[in-house]
């Protein structure tokens, strides 16, 4: 008799995507981040669900309800900090996952890549709205500054911002709708993840060499299930270290002050995972230009497949591109640092140089490097 996992309509789907899935025999730890992102999403949905049971999305009680969760709810502090730091781990995995895709040329799987970009935008939107919910100073002013950016859109900008706010400033209506969106988006993300995987399984996984691996496949289970579990353990260890030893390390002290529309904090800045984009936004001395640069800093991922002119898919055997890739990583770290600094000399100039370098590497230098490497192949 055939095994039930191969015949049962529901189990058959699970079997084809998690058990008997043919996987390349040489995928490295960089391929762990997909499953780690799945784990992060599950952690966020579960902790978020329990937080939502005790949270109130009203301007008068939001801050107090978060305090109540931390003080009076059983292990509420743990749930709250798991959720807050879980978001940080989520973005660490996200950026590693995207970086892996760029390095090994995974963006040639167009549908998978494009769904991935939509997922990135969705996760960023969710994280932004979640940051507003505790209704501290940085929540309020972050929401005010970022939503205000939409007013740079010609003609409809101001109307659009007031429509999003549900009034003439960030207030009760804004908080309530942000809570509603913050609750629903993770489930939309989960659905998009299914589509992401559906498209991935049409082609199969890429591998470090960038060479088709159809001639050398191994079953996902037990080889990669055990490898994924090791990743899960390491991620959980890191998250628990963060939550139990320094839960506020990545947060902003200003968010422990209740929101006050009459008092602007000296330095308004987003969470660390948005600082690179924030630095790019600030480095352009024009509102609309800054907003366009901000959107393009992420949307530029969509043109990677168009700029791929190398004869090799992966960067594994392309030393010039490798050097440029790691300069790009260093540049993003520089931008992240600049995003957290005040707008004054020399940070302004460093930010502008780093922003120009970011776009130059992607749009000009990497394609040029590919041309040179193609030439070298002929010698």
From Swiss-Prot:
It is found in: Mitochondrion inner membrane. InterPro entries: Cyt_b/b6_C, Cyt_b/b6_C_sf, Cyt_b/b6_N, Cytb/b6-like_sf, Cytochrome_b, Cytochrome_b_C_euk/bac, Cytochrome_b_N_euk/bac, Di-haem_cyt_TM. Its cofactor is heme b. Keywords: Electron transport, Heme, Iron, Membrane, Metal-binding, Mitochondrion, Mitochondrion inner membrane, Respiratory chain, Transmembrane, Transmembrane helix, Transport, Ubiquinone. Pfam families: Cytochrom_B_C (PF00032), Cytochrome_B (PF00033). The keyword Mitochondrion applies. The chain crosses the membrane at residues 33-53, 77-98, 113-133, 178-198, 226-246, 288-308, 320-340, 347-367. Heme b b566 binds at residues 97, 196. It is a multi-pass membrane protein. Binds 2 heme b groups non-covalently. GO terms for molecular function: metal ion binding; ubiquinol-cytochrome-c reductase activity. The keyword Metal-binding applies. A ubiquinone binds at residue 201. Gene3D superfamilies: Cytochrome Bc1 Complex, Chain C (1.20.810.10). Heme b b562 binds at residues 83, 182. Component of the ubiquinol-cytochrome c reductase complex (complex III or cytochrome b-c1 complex) that is part of the mitochondrial respiratory chain. The b-c1 complex mediates electron transfer from ubiquinol to cytochrome c. Contributes to the generation of a proton gradient across the mitochondrial membrane that is then used for ATP synthesis. Belongs to the cytochrome b family. This is Cytochrome b.
């Amino acid at each position: 008799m055939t095994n039930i996992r191969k015949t049962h309509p529901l189990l058959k789907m699970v079997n084809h995507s998690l058990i008997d899935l043919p996987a390349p025999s040489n995928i490295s730890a960089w391929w762990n981040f997909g499953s780690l992102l799945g784990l992060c999403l599950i952690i966020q949905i579960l902790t978020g669900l329990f937080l939502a049971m005790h949270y109130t999305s009203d301007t008068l009680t939001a801050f107090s309800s978060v305090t109540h969760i931390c003080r009076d709810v059983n292990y509420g502090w743990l749930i709250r900090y798991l959720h807050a730091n879980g978001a940080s781990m989520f973005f660490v995995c996200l950026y590693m996952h995207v970086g892996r895709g760029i390095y090994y040329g995974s963006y040639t799987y167009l549908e998978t890549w494009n769904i991935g970009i939509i997922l990135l935008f969705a996760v960023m939107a969710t994280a932004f709205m979640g940051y507003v919910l505790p209704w501290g100073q940085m929540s309020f002013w972050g929401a005010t500054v970022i939503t205000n950016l939409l007013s740079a859109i010609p003609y409809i900008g101001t109307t659009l911002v007031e429509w999003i706010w549900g009034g003439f400033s960030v207030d009760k209506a804004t908080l309530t709708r942000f809570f509603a969106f913050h609750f629903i988006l993770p489930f939309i993300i989960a659905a998009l993840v299914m589509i992401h995987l559906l498209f991935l399984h049409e082609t199969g996984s890429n591998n470090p060499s960038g060479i088709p691996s159809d001639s050398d496949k191994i079953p996902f289970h037990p080889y990669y299930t055990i490898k994924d579990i090791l990743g899960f353990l390491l991620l959980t260890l890191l998250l628990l270290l963060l939550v139990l030893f320094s839960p506020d390390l990545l947060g902003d002290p200003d968010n422990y002050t209740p929101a006050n529309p009459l008092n602007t904090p000296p330095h308004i800045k987003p969470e660390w995972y948005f600082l690179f984009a924030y630095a790019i936004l600030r480095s352009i001395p024009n509102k609309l230009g800054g907003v366009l640069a901000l959107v393009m800093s992420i949307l530029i991922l969509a043109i990677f497949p168009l700029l791929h002119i190398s004869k090799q898919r992966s960067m594994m055997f392309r030393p010039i591109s490798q050097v440029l890739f790691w300069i790009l990583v260093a540049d993003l770290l520089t931008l992240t640092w600049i995003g957290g600094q005040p707008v004054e000399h020399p940070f302004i100039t460093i930010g502008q140089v780093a922003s120009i370098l970011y776009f130059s590497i992607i749009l000009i230098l990497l394609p040029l490097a590919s041309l040179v490497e193609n030439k070298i192949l002929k010698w």
